[in-house]
UniProtKB/Swiss-Prot annotation:
Principal EC category: transferase
SUPFAM superfamilies the record matches: Trimeric LpxA-like enzymes
Pfam families: Hexapep_2, THDPS_N_2
Protein name in UniProt: 2,3,4,5-tetrahydropyridine-2,6-dicarboxylate N-succinyltransferase
Organism whose genome encodes this protein: Paraburkholderia phytofirmans (strain DSM 17436 / LMG 22146 / PsJN) (Burkholderia phytofirmans)
Length: 275
């Protein structure tokens, strides 16, 4: 079924200039709607780990983008205090008490998740925003004013602290999604964007900014890398001097690495304060 969906969506993507809310073949509408439904249920994912490596299903990103071409804006009620006007309805627009009970997650007002995002059991959504295509796995916390961008992948038992920004990647299409693996802590007001991967059991301190051009300096080895935080890293904001010594530029500093047992036993503040 997925291969057939992919073929229809890939073909529709090549002919996307011809598509509009008033002009689209029925099979394309059905394929896109089905793909969004599967994303919403967590049965399909924009990215998944296979044999230790993350693989991006680009056709599902195409399906999300096509859905914007196929839908008109429409008024959406907001509980009597306002209205919205958009193409993508709320994930919870038609939820019943039974649906919420079956989902097993908490949604604290006025948290918003768009249809096509997946929220797993024991997730807590504080007043926050989760965009279409995102996947938030079991036991994670999306804290107040945090944003989970389009197609971002959040692992199990992750804590996204207040005001954290996890970037979205619908455009440009070739960009990979941001991935936060299991058991990570992302400190308040930090930003992770442009397809950066934070590997499991890592701790990102408050106010750390990570993009593909951000230098990641490992103080134990002196190595500078980009785009990936190794498993078990404790990361703080820092600066590196220029070659001529006239100025310094922002970087992220890996101050230490810890294993899962240490991460579980030692408090976050102790990890971040330790030498």
């Amino acid at each position: 079924m997925s291969q057939q969906l992919q073929q229809i969506i890939d073909t529709a993507w090549e002919n996307r200039a011809e598509l509009s809310p008033k002009a689209a073949p029925a099979d394309v509408r059905e394929a896109v709607a089905h793909a969004i439904e599967q994303l919403d249920k967590g049965l399909l994912r924009v990215a998944e780990k296979k044999d230790g490596d993350w693989v991006v299903n680009q056709w599902l990103k195409k399906a999300v983008l096509l859905s914007f071409r196929l839908e008109d804006n429409a008024p959406m009620p907001a509980g009597g205090y306002s209205q919205f006007y958009d193409k993508v309805p709320s994930k919870f627009a038609n939820y019943t008490a039974e649906d919420f009970a079956a989902g097993g997650f908490r949604v604290v007002p006025p948290a918003i998740a768009r249809r096509g995002s997946f929220i797993a059991k024991n997730v807590v959504l504080m007043p926050s925003y989760t965009n279409i295509g995102a996947y938030v796995d079991e036991g994670s916390m999306v804290d107040t004013w945090a944003t989970v961008g389009s197609c971002a992948q959040i692992g199990k038992n992750v804590h996204l602290s207040g005001g954290v920004g996890i970037g979205g990647v619908l455009e440009p299409l070739q960009a990979n999604p941001v991935i936060i693996e299991d058991n990570c802590f992302i400190g308040a007001r930090s930003e992770v964007v442009e397809g950066v991967i934070v590997e499991e059991n890592s701790v990102i301190s408050m106010g750390v900014y990570l993009g593909q051009s951000t230098k990641i300096y490992d103080r134990e080895t002196g190595e500078v890398t980009y785009g990936r935080i190794p498993a078990g890293s404790v990361v703080v904001a820092g600066n590196l001097p220029s070659k001529d010594g006239t100025h310094s530029l922002y970087c992220a500093v890996i101050v230490k690495k810890v294993d899962a047992k240490t991460r579980a036993k030692v408090g976050l503040n102790e990890l971040l304060r330790g030498d």
